[in-house]
Amino acid sequence: MKELTIISGKGGTGKTSILGAFATLAGSSLLCDCDVDAANLHILLNPSIKETYEFYGEKKAEILPELCTDCGKCEELCQFKAIQKGQINSYACEGCAVCYHVCPAEAIKMKPHLSGHWYISDTKWGPMVHAKLGIAQGNSGLLVNRVRKKAREVAKEHNLSLIISDGPPGIGCPVISSLAGTDMALVVTEPTASGIHDLERIVKVASGFGCITAVCINKYNLDEDNCRFIEDLAEKLEVPVIGKIPYDAAMAEAVLKGIPVTILGQGAAQEPLGELWQQVKHLLGAR
Amino acid sequence: MRVAVSASGQTQLDELNPRLGRCEYFVIVDDVSGETWAIENTGRLSTGAAGIATATLLHNHQVDVVITGNVGPNAFTALEAAEIKVYTGTKGKVQDLLEQYRNGNLSKASGPNVGPHGS
Amino acid sequence: MRISIASGKGGTGKTLVATSLALSLMDQPRPVQLLDCDVEEPNAHIFFKMKQAGSQKVFLPIPKVDYDQCQYCGKCVEVCQFNAIALMKRTLVIFPDVCHSCGGCWYLCPTEALQPTPREVGAVGISQSGSFTLVSGTLKLGTHISPPVIKAVRAKEDPDSIVIIDGPPGSSCPVMTIVDGTDYCILVTEPTPFGLNDLVLAVEMLQVLGIACGVVINRDVPENDIIDRYCEDKGLPILLRIPLKTEIARAYAKGITLVESDPHWKPKFLELYQRVVREVAQ
């Protein structure tokens, strides 16, 4: 079984659109959305949810009213102003447990907090594992781990030889969780100042995992100077540029229709996307 | 002397997991007795700063050397304080990495090789 | 009047709306404050060529060990939920960048060997021009807990001013810190399914917090009503539409605000403000 993770550093470079195209070109694979903070792969792949699971992240404080003596000690010591009039505001609570330790009546307990859900779904192009973190919940790295572990199990069950994962933007903990143990990281970038700025950092992160790392420049013809700059930078970083996708209004149109661009079947991006996919398959096959 | 390898499974045939703080297990080998066993990395379940919790776990298991892929600044500081030496590799089975270590083919980390959160 | 500006998705034009709104209100009898709470990437100052009048550092308490008092009992390690303290070979190691400043370790240390000591986490800068004030927060590099710096910026809120708060993208903790306690939230989005997806998340968050909101559609195209349909369904007002035009993007990329590059936008932003005032009054 091989795993491909698509990442970008900066958000909005077209990562999810390219993954949507790959899903159709692969025919049958396990699709995995690791962007649990703001998942959006479902917009293109239209999954039907088969199984829903709860995700418990960090612990938060809870007051047992029958034991509480209203002494006010917890309220006085809470640095996050999460306790007011004997009530805990779970959005403000950071789970530091100071209240739990100082309560003389042992009226506070730390309870695992429901921070999100994850799902196993069906799509036209294979099963999909995805998640939704609750409002203002932390710990997305842990949820990404959970999602990827399940993705491997489901892929095994269905005898699928490929997992394609959509990574979250940025270079933080959830990105690391989506790269660990993957066979290949495809970095989707664009020829803008911030695209250039983020490329070096994300390539360094990916190369720390010993996976194949390659770059794809999306909307490359928007700024040909910046595009060349990215190609030079990639060479310096010793990562190949395996695809250059032109700006194509069909990409935006496909998003509006909620389908992968390859299903729309028109526009200047079709052929380069097909070639990019061949390159990806070639690199993964050689590993 | 005890050598631990961050791994995705519990045996020497399992693969290295390059993430010190988020690996599932450590496969530990005692150089003197030749004994091998595995411990679960409970540090990985931490909300944050899993690398520090993991370093504490290794310290509690009297590990002298750890072989892994990525070490962040906090984990490195913690391991240094615990006098645990860090050697880094990129991939392979636990037994291969142990072999490379014994042959002197792994490099000893003199500082963190990734930023916080592995970035 | 305190108005927060948010967007689920990054790059939708939040700062574009915040800066033009602030500039359009300059002739109002009340003073105007613009709070830039995007402390990881503050950029509102680019649009106002004002000299910074002053800057204050933001500190948070972190523990400091008095090794003469420390008994190496491990109580602090047990108490700390964030792994910010480790006990190794009879040394206590503190990790400032993961510390949440909860105070657990120094309250509960049996020998008072841990004492709070200030750590710089960011700065708040203030610039003033007439009745307009710009307050910007900056998170110190290497620090990644932004709410304390956001709170320090918000501590400068003047109750007699019209306060406009520009924050980071997303719907996570820092965003909650900027919208919390405001009278109204303006959500800036774009008419794509991705924009809608993230708008829905932001609206859900505001509902939980009980904050009224309305929507600004940026890069609007007449043939697309994806955001309109959602807003109609949820009863959310559409406050303003900014069309998809390359002139707008180009001028903005040069650091020129919308109302400055095209003054006919000024009455529209004024109208937007009056609409918000009416919505809040209801």
Regions found by a protein language model. Name each.
Chain B
Residues 1-53, 60-61, 80-82, 89-119:
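Non-catalytic interface/targeting segments
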Residues 69:
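Conserved residues at the C-terminal ends of beta-strands
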